[in-house]
Amino acid sequence: MVMSENSNISYCQAVANRTSFFTTAYNGIPETLILNTIFWVLLILLFTVLRHQAGDFGRLALVNSNGSKKRWTEIFYSRAASVVDPQPSTSTQVSPRPSTTSQGVPDSTPLSPIQPEEGLFGWIRVTLKLRKETILLHTGPDAVHYLSFQQHLMAVMALVTIVSLVIILPVNFLNGPKENPYDVNAFGRTTMANLSPDSPWLWVHTIITILYIPLVVLIMRRASGRNAFKKAATRTIMISNISSSDRNKTVVRNYMQELFPDVTIENVSIAYNISRLYVRNAEFERVHEARLYCEHHRNRDTLMVKPEMCSCKKENAYEYYQREERKLSGDVARLRASTMNEPLDIAFITVSTVQEAQNIVTHFTPGTYRQWHLVFAPSPDDLFWENLNVNKSHWYLKFFCVNAVLFLVLFFLSTPAMVVSLLNSRPWVKETEGKISPLVADFLPTLMLWTLSALMPVIVAISDKWMRHYTRSKQNYSIMTKCFGYLLMMIMILPSLGLTSAQALLEWGFLNQTDRWQCIFLPDRGSFYVNYIITAAFIGTALELLRFPELIVYIWSLLKAKSKAETPYIRKAILIEFPFGTHYAWTTLVFTIAIVYSVACPLIMPFAMIYICLKHFVDRHNLYFAYGPSNMISRKGGKIHSTAVTMTKFSVVILVLVMAMICFFRGDNGMARFLLLIISLAITLTLFTFMSPIKRCAATRRPSIVEIAGPAPIYVPDVLKDNGIRTSSVRPSAAAFGGYGSDSVSEYDSSQYSVNSVEA
């Protein structure tokens, strides 16, 4: 930025030097791009080789307990997870999901096989040719909504990229002052800082900034708009705050029938405290799977087990698991019996029609004796049954403590920019700075920042699982909003102000250092984010394909296993659901950074476009081939999707605010542009607050989930269903993943959905 005073120039340059050390032309962007491209090619080749070695086994092979000879690559990188057995199941196993009939026969439409992969890189063509109908049937409506959200972002970013390269970049590059302080090869010459404060060409940036508001809103509203999806009413109502004396099916049924005599009540279920039973049943499943493995093994007598992890003592595996199974079977039976004596204050009542349920929820008023709270029940699959026993007061206390600790740690102490600042202050860095290759010096900071910022969502996700949310949709929503907020502050807002932590932000406010505002969007700051997005686009997306975190969890589980007989159970347990909360936050953050910097630093947009395209391709592949189905159906189950669309509004709001501040602090000649931008910002905030053009999930009354004929979902946890102890072992236990994971592709009735109902 061309500052009005030399002192401000030196001050801002000093601030920039504390958060990055770029030394070459274009601030290391060519070097970072070259290194990232090389690493991306190597990682893609590694993934392709691993996938080719995996063979055509597919995700459904996980449920085959006889697959003892499978290699680890067959679990993570298998190629043929595309075909579902179209034949109805003839087993007597209890269906783990409401997508099956009461007899346990799947009633979903079988998937159409995709074309087989041909050649080493055939997986790329197969991924690109995946149809929306196939993804919907195979992975669930959440995946279709998520991919549709990304496609709308791609449309916005494509238009912004064209404007940035065709209009803004030539204006910035060709209309600098005669005595230009930037070299022709300097990155600053491509930014808005190249224009003098009194240049009339700055009106181009102002007008484009204002035009971006309707552009983003009109396109992104189609990602929710009339499809504020998965908010439809169901026939089942969840009743909470039931007193201990009323926790009985008969009492609940009679009271509701007395209040609503014209309503036909089909079923009443009481929730029970299954937290201990859930853990014990998971242990039983592990031992049961291991016993079956030993029973079908060719050399059953030679299989040995180590009862203790750090012990050399061994014994016959079949006898050990047989003994442990009998013991755990008795424990589970006793816990099931005791669980029935621990009813919770939650009940589920199913009526005959959606209209009757709507009438009950609308007209029910708590009485003087029974202060019940009625809401539409989430899907049984969306519930964490083992968490329903958590007291609300304890939950809110834990919520406050967890978020306070997260705020102190992530917001004040460990921002990525602070780590770079600390490294730059070390003497050995200053001594070796001239000796280090510029190629390495420009590449490592952004790679390190990307790595540190990638750890933050992991910390947030772990803490949220410890909080024990009641539903998967609420857990994903909480993770998404917190990750987006922390990432936005840590990755964009604080570094853009030349601050390394929120602590520095407070010090700045108390010391009244107004010169800081003049450091907004220095040329080096824009190049920093260009390098950051390049790293996220190439190395970040390639690592998402390889899924090293899941691989580490898998290897650690194998190391903890007492024998190789536990391997089939471990292989089932690694199939988790796609973490929508984290990925929504990451995608929206990069979109926000790109839009905010698109006017001041137009070179950021091509790389942001590359990021969203690669991210969409990688997520498309992983959703179909790597992760289990997701179906967060509840009255507010679509809130995570509609809120992600709403969060895109932050990009244009911050863009207008930043452009207004730049006009204000660059001298008196920009006051007209400043006033125009402030008026536009006020109008935008007013519309977003009172007349939001992006419809919220709660705004529509038209059901988007069609109630189908047949029995309603059974609101009973799997561990309490008939024959649940024995047959629940066919499901992959997700105890290690906080209740996530499944082995069935048809976990929901896909006939409830169509592609048109989940995509604008």
Swiss-Prot record:
Extracellular compartment residues: 1-28, 174-199, 420-442, 500-525, 587-589, 666-673
Tissue-specificity statement: Expressed in multidendritic neurons (md-L) in the fly tongue. Expressed in multiple humidity responsive neurons.
GO molecular function annotations of the record: calcium-activated cation channel activity; mechanosensitive monoatomic cation channel activity; mechanosensitive monoatomic ion channel activity
Annotated region described as Intracellular linker IL2, given as residue ranges: 228-391
UniProt entry keywords in alphabetical sequence: Ion channel, Ion transport, Lysosome, Membrane, Transmembrane, Transmembrane helix, Transport
Designated gene of the protein: Tmem63
Entry's Gene Ontology cellular component terms: apical part of cell; cytoplasm; lysosomal membrane; plasma membrane
Compartmental location: Lysosome membrane
Principal localisation: membrane
Ranges of the Cytoplasmic topological domain: 50-152, 221-398, 464-478, 547-568, 611-634, 695-760
Organism domain of life: Eukaryota
Taxonomic lineage from the root: Eukaryota, Metazoa, Ecdysozoa, Arthropoda, Hexapoda
Transmembrane intervals: 29-49, 153-173, 200-220, 399-419, 443-463, 479-499, 526-546, 569-586, 590-610, 635-665, 674-694
GO BP terms, alphabetized: detection of humidity stimulus involved in sensory perception; lysosome organization; mechanosensory behavior; monoatomic cation transmembrane transport; monoatomic cation transport; monoatomic ion transmembrane transport; regulation of response to food
Similarity comment: family membership: Belongs to the CSC1 (TC 1.A.17) family.
Deletion phenotype: Flies show reduced lifespan and age-dependent motor defects due to progressive synaptic loss. Defects in ability to discriminate particle size in food due to impaired activation of multidendritic neurons (md-L) by mechanical stimuli and the ability to choose food.
InterPro entries: Csc1-like (IPR045122), CSC1/OSCA1-like_7TM (IPR003864), CSC1/OSCA1-like_cyt (IPR027815), Csc1/OSCA1-like_N (IPR032880)
Role, per record: Mechanosensitive cation channel involved in lysosomal morphology and sensitivity to food texture and humidity. Acts as a regulator of lysosomal morphology by mediating lysosomal mechanosensitivity. Mechanosensitive cation channel in multidendritic neurons (md-L) in the tongue required to discriminate particle sizes in food: acts by promoting activation of md-L neurons in response to mechanical stimuli. Also acts as a sensor of humidity change in olfactory sensory neurons.
Protein's name according to its UniProt entry: Mechanosensitive cation channel Tmem63
One Pfam match: RSN1_7TM
Protein topology in the membrane: Multi-pass membrane protein
